[in-house]
Amino acid sequence: MVLEPSRGAFVAMPSVEEAREVFEVRRVLETDMTRKLCPVITDHQIAELRAHLRTEKEALSNTNVAGRTQLLADFHVVLATMLGNSVLTKMLSELLARSSLIALMYQSTLSAIESQEEHVAIVDALE
């Protein structure tokens, strides 16, 4: 949402360049985040992630695109929260809000399925 004085509120329309930049920053943060989580993750946290994966999978089978987009983004927030770094969690949440808008604009169902499969691979690697 973009607020413009004397004009009102508008939905932000990210450019292709902004989309690339957002995903580049996410890649850097999420790669390091996953590396740091790997040696300290608990069985309980793995179970929590597996439950989230089941919810993602269910969301892919219905037509609620916004809901599935939110769940796919939430996966990364769950990982960040597990590290206990509130600054990282907040920064990632802000990036995910931007990338979710991009996903709503451009992500196909096939691409969403591939994202969910990547999440499964991440949890498998963490386990």
Question: What residue spans do the PLM features occupy?
Answer:
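Mg2+-dependent prenyl diphosphate-binding active-site environment of isoprenoid biosynthetic enzymes
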Residues: 30
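Active-site loop of classical SDR/Rossmann-like NAD(P)-dependent oxidoreductases
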Residues: 111-113
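Helix-turn-helix-type domain boundary/helix-start signal
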Residues: 9-12, 39, 81
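Conserved amphipathic alpha-helical segments that form helical-bundle/coiled-coil interaction surfaces
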Residues: 18, 22, 26, 34, ...
